[in-house]
């Protein structure tokens, strides 16, 4: 009996959670930013290296939390290299859902988008468009991409 599409994606999420890609840090990152989901305790710190044209060259992350938040960070760290900083800023919740391959329950959306939000906020801070110490995904956050 074959694995259904949804089961395959669930296995992929578990694989990224148990064997995260690009886990660690980049000492000479262009920017580093940290975020947390206070409602469940997920944390992600992300390092991003940009080239001279502001295209993402490398991403590393470290953190702690549920399978969805950590798998999302791992998958995003593989997806972002080769992406422009503008393309990163345009990503939204649907991009993360598509990347994960499963529907995310309303209670887990903040877990799923934490890494994306950390990367986007880090980019905005780098560009001088935002002054923020830590990304938060607590409460009704209007900045969580729809």
What is each PLM-predicted segment?
Residues 40, 63-71:
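Short, thiol/selenol-centered motifs that function as redox-active sites or metal-ligating centers
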Residues 1-27, 32-33, 57, 83-146:
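C-terminal binding/interaction regions
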Residues 29, 46, 68-70, 87:
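Basic, gly/Ser/Thr/Pro-rich low-complexity segments located predominantly at protein N termini
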Residues 42-52:
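Short beta-strand elements
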Residues 72-82:
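Alpha-helical support elements that line or immediately flank enzyme active sites
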Residues 34-39:
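Short Gly/Pro-enriched turn/cap motifs at secondary-structure boundaries
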Residues 54-63:
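Immediate flanking context of iron-sulfur cluster ligation sites
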């Amino acid at each position: 009996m074959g694995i259904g599409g949804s089961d395959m994606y669930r296995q992929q999420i578990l694989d990224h959670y148990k064997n995260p890609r690009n886990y660690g840090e980049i000492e000479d990152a262009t920017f580093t930013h940290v975020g947390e989901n206070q409602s469940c305790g997920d944390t992600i710190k992300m390092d991003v290296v940009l080239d001279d044209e502001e295209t993402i060259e490398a991403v590393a992350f470290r953190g702690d939390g549920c399978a969805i938040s950590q798998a999302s960070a791992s998958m995003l760290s593989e997806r972002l290299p080769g992406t422009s900083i503008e393309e990163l800023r345009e990503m939204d919740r649907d991009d993360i859902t598509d990347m994960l391959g499963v529907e995310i329950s309303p209670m887990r959306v903040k877990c799923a988008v934490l890494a994306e939000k950390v990367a986007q906020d880090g980019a905005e801070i780098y560009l001088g468009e935002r002054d923020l110490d830590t990304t938060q995904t607590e409460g009704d956050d209007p900045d969580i991409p729809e």
